[in-house]
Amino acid sequence: MKNRFNSEDKIILAIDGLDLNQAKLLLEKCPSIKWVKVGLELFVREGPRVVEILKGLNKKIFLDLKFHDIPNTMSAACFQVSKLGVDIISVHSSAGLKALQDSKKASLEGASLANLKPPFVVGITVLTSFSLKDFQTDLDRKNSIEDNVLRLAKLSFDAELDGCVCSPWEVKMLRSIYKNNFELITPGIRLKIDNKDDQNRIMTPNEAIDNGASKLVIGRSISKALDPNKALIEIFKSIDSD
């Protein structure tokens, strides 16, 4: 049996699509949630105060804004959000090595200025919404998703980021390369009874953990459940079991 504390630390509840009051109500229903993902929609609607409110509820925060711009702009954004006290921030690995290096450095500087623990910075590889066909057609790519994930994960690693975000389909491949010194955060997590919605490269929680995922980003499987806490407990059980 795996350690329950460890299992609780592996689940990041995505509250995208909820307003702040709905998010707080969901967290009241799921008191064992330690991690919350704040995406672009909620952050734009509520502003930085959403971070302050969630920190007041003693939650760890993955601020998933997926920064992607020129190095100066990306690093300036990372500097600012690192002063908010978030625990993980995301940047697009495809922005390039310098942008990633500068973003990591800026996150350390911002946190230091605010006397806070620096956040992990993780690189986005290939979004889980892409199927192979859409990826190759829409982005005019000739090689596979796996090849692109490998390239972007290496870029993140070489820039000394703390990890990367990938679909559960690529976790096993990356874990075999980077062992245990690189965070692998996986969205695209669905229960067997769920619709896949707008996700394509999906996997169950237990499968993703077994393949080597560090943390799972789960939203609708919990937030849309008739009993969110029951759904959460079932997820804990599935990743606790050997």
UniProtKB/Swiss-Prot annotation:
The active site is at residue 66. Substrate binds at residues 16, 37, 64-73, 128, 190, 199, 219-220. It catalyses: orotidine 5'-phosphate + H(+) = UMP + CO2. SMART domains: OMPdecase. Gene3D superfamilies: Aldolase class I. One of its GO terms (molecular function) is orotidine-5'-phosphate decarboxylase activity. Keywords: Decarboxylase, Lyase, Pyrimidine biosynthesis. One of its GO terms (biological process) is 'de novo' pyrimidine nucleobase biosynthetic process. One of its GO terms (cellular component) is cytosol. Pathway: Pyrimidine metabolism; UMP biosynthesis via de novo pathway; UMP from orotate: step 2/2. InterPro entries: Aldolase_TIM (IPR013785), OMPdecase (IPR014732), OMPdecase_AS (IPR018089), OMPdecase_bac (IPR047596), OMPdeCOase_dom (IPR001754), RibuloseP-bd_barrel (IPR011060). Its EC number is 4.1.1.23. Belongs to the OMP decarboxylase family. Type 1 subfamily. Homodimer. Catalyzes the decarboxylation of orotidine 5'-monophosphate (OMP) to uridine 5'-monophosphate (UMP). This is Orotidine 5'-phosphate decarboxylase. The gene is pyrF.
